[in-house]
Amino acid sequence: MSAEARLKELGIVLPKVPDPVANYLPYRIAGNLLFLAGQGPRDENGKHLSGKVGAEVSVEEAYRRARIIGLQLLSATRMALGSLDRVDTVVKMLCMVNAVPDFKDH
């Protein structure tokens, strides 16, 4: 099953790619590689969601925000390539959690 068909089957609608908050592009293609700009969680109105996991943000809310970021990345990928079905392999992904120093529930 294709990636696009799977999203449709799951009823997942990808969000709009967030507008850059500085002078950068949401993606760059170099040869046959796609590089995506970093993403942070945003609400349905595009407002940046902040806070530290383990303090202002619960683990459950952090999972919800991580899902939002994942969908934003898929949306940026679709914008860059025209279809998620053009993705062959993910070579590297860096993920960061803004958490309190003693957070251990990764």
At which residue positions do the language-model features occur?
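Short, polar/acidic, helix-capping and beta-turn segments at strand->helix junctions
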Residues: 1-106
